[in-house]
């Protein structure tokens, strides 16, 4: 799940921990399978696979699962896995836009499930290009907030590596850069000894839409329903849930 931090913060509080963990595991496993299919099972000769495995390990995916994913992706088990990346566009309540990133081995299934989830929860599918222009591809790295670490500390570590900005987002600092600068950002953080996660290219909204309480409730139900689909890797949005509205949502629980 990806979007404005106010959405992310609320979403984390509302989501079931076990469900999030299972979804995250599936995402990392798919990433490993795709990288192994493209470049083979040897991490030393396949940088994309090495990175995918590193991310999975950082997020506590068991080694057995990782090994099986590498073998499946590389075709060493006799299985054939052919994933396709697809982007769907949708509209939500109060002018919100959703950019839905899927990785699937069945395009018809993915399209059908996304359409059903969107329409059943008050959204509408959008024509190609009618939502995409609201987003830009960025590199985003989440740096863990350790004792004493400040926003300025992170900025100083990554400034010369091409970082556009560092954002203070509740329990992490977000380093935002051009997607092509991600390797340099990772290297700079490693050199500074700073722990980081979720170092991926993401679609970021160029402008956000503020939601009131009713709109936020509808939006979260819609985003949750789409994000829970097996083929969905990420849901990006221009939705912003202001602090006072977020407080109302927390009172609902």
UniProtKB/Swiss-Prot annotation:
Any one GO MF annotation of this record: DNA binding
- Subcellular location, principal: cytoplasm
Do you know which InterPro entries this protein is assigned to?
Integrase-like_N (IPR017856), TACO1_YebC-like_2nd/3rd_dom (IPR048300), TACO1_YebC_N (IPR049083), Transcrip_reg_TACO1-like (IPR002876), Transcrip_reg_TACO1-like_dom3 (IPR026564), YebC-like (IPR029072)
Where does it localize? Cytoplasm
This protein's GO cellular component annotations are: cytosol
From its record, what is one biological process in GO terms?
A: regulation of DNA-templated transcription
Q: Which Gene3D superfamilies match?
A: 1.10.10.200, 3.30.70.980
* Record's keyword terms, sorted: Cytoplasm, DNA-binding, Transcription, Transcription regulation
Q: Which NCBIfam families match?
A: PRK00110.1, PRK12378.1, YebC/PmpR family DNA-binding transcriptional regulator
Q: Which PANTHER family match?
A: TRANSCRIPTIONAL REGULATORY PROTEIN YEBC-RELATED, TRANSLATIONAL ACTIVATOR OF CYTOCHROME C OXIDASE 1
* Family of this protein: Belongs to the TACO1 family.
Name of the protein in its database record: Probable transcriptional regulatory protein KRH_13670
């Amino acid at each position: 799940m990806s979007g404005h931090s106010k959405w992310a913060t609320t979403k984390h509080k509302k989501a079931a921990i076990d469900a999030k963990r299972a979804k995250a595991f599936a995402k990392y496993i798919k990433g490993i399978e795709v990288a192994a299919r493209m470049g083979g099972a040897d991490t030393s000769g396949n940088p994309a696979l090495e990175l995918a495995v590193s991310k999975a390990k950082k997020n506590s995916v068991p080694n057995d699962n990782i090994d099986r994913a590498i073998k499946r992706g590389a075709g060493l088990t006799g299985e054939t896995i052919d994933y396709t990346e697809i982007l769907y566009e949708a509209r939500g309540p109060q002018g919100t836009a959703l950019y839905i990133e899927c990785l699937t081995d069945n395009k018809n299934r993915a399209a059908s499930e996304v359409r059903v989830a969107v329409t059943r929860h008050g959204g509408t599918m959008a024509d190609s290009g009618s939502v995409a222009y609201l987003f830009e591809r960025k590199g985003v790295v989440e740096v863990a907030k350790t004792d004493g670490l400040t926003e300025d500390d992170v900025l100083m570590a990554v400034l010369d590596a091409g970082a556009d900005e560092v954002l203070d987002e509740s329990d992490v600092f977000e380093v935002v850069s051009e997607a092509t600068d991600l390797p340099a950002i990772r290297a700079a953080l490693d050199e500074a000894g700073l722990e980081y996660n979720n170092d991926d290219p993401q679609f970021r909204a160029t402008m956000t839409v503020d939601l009131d309480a009713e709109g936020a409730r509808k939006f979260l139900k819609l985003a949750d329903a789409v994000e829970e689909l097996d083929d969905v890797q990420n849901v990006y949005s221009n939705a912003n849930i202001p602090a006072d509205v977020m407080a109302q949502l927390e009172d609902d629980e």
